[in-house]
């Protein structure tokens, strides 16, 4: 039996997307991260005139969760206008907490697809590589 309802996570991500601050790209992203505890942490992208300082929705959700004590995650839903996937930096940050994370990639029309972090970031770098 599945531990979560994909539609609940996708809806939370859609709602988070509405809070995005994207005056430069107009590319609004929302994320909803499900912790092992059952809590959902949301995030949106926050752009900056100095582009490298922009914070992605996925990383916002992770930082919120970790700052509240959550360290284990089940799934994340990411919603964009066109169903774009998480960027490389977000994939790597999510990888820090495990590679079996379910990733739901949705768009504003309600379509989504399901994948895993292992599929999006094969042969990834992890804490085990640092300890060698």
Per-region residue spans from a language model:
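Small-residue (primarily alanine) positions within well-ordered alpha-helices
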Residues: 13, 31-32, 61, 65
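Short, compositionally biased leader-like segments
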Residues: 1-10, 71
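Short, basic/aromatic recognition patches
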Residues: 7-22
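Short solvent-exposed loop/turn micro-motifs enriched in small/polar/acidic residues
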Residues: 24-26, 87
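Short beta-strand scaffold segments in enzyme catalytic cores
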Residues: 26-35
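Zn2+-dependent cytidine deaminase-like catalytic core
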Residues: 42-129
């Amino acid at each position: 039996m599945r531990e979560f309802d994909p539609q609940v996570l996708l809806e939370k991500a859609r709602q988070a997307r509405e809070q995005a601050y994207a005056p430069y790209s107009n590319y609004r992203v929302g994320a909803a991260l499900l912790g092992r505890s059952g809590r959902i942490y949301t995030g949106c992208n926050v752009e900056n005139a100095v582009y490298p300082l922009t914070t992605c929705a996925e990383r916002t959700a992770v930082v919120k969760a970790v700052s509240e004590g959550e360290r284990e995650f089940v799934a994340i839903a990411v919603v964009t206008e066109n169903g774009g996937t998480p960027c490389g930096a977000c994939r790597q940050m999510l990888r820090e907490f495990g590679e079996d994370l379910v990733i739901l990639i949705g768009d504003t029309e309600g379509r989504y697809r399901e994948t895993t972090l292992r599929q999006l970031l094969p042969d990834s770098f992890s804490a085990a590589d640092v300890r060698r």
